[in-house]
């Protein structure tokens, strides 16, 4: 039997949302076990997953996302390698996440733009038209002074897929 849990969305404090009474929401019945890493095109894996740990990438551990520490459990279970992309002047990159039928899959993406650079990342989550499962993507980003990061996400998943987008 697979254990399920509820994940809380929006740990970030925001007075407007607090006033409206919707500061937190629950995503129900998320499996605790059975998570895989989302397959990504080979060129991206070769280019961006073996980046050495430096102070900049280490600092991403302190960046909070909307799902907070709860998504960390899924990250550990999936054993997903972090995809780390940084800009040098102006850079554009495409990520295609291919989610498979019947799978729960996770991807961990970190984006960094040094001072006065521009980084654009197009991210497409896709599946077969009749597939089902859960696709979860956590994206953390950091932009230095004068830098810009543009994140364009396309959800091309089947209507039977549940998509968790943790930015």
Place the predicted regions along the sequence by residue:
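Conserved beta-strand/loop scaffold segments within soluble protein domains that form the structured core
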Residues: 64-167
């Amino acid at each position: 039997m697979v254990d399920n849990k509820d994940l809380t969305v929006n740990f970030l404090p925001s007075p407007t949302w607090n006033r409206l009474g919707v500061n937190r929401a629950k995503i129900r019945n998320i499996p605790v076990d059975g998570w895989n890493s989302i397959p990504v095109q080979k060129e991206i894996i070769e280019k961006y997953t073996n980046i050495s740990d430096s102070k900049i990438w280490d600092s991403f551990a302190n960046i909070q996302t909307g799902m907070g520490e709860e998504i960390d459990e899924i990250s550990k279970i999936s054993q997903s390698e972090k995809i780390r992309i940084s800009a040098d002047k102006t850079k554009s990159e495409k990520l295609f996440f291919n989610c498979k039928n019947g799978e729960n899959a996770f991807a961990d993406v970190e984006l960094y733009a040094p001072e006065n650079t521009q980084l654009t990342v197009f991210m497409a989550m896709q599946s077969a038209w009749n597939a089902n499962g859960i696709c979860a993507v956590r994206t953390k980003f950091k932009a230095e002074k004068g830098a810009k990061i543009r994140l364009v996400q396309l959800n091309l998943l089947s209507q039977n897929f549940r998509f968790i987008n943790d930015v």
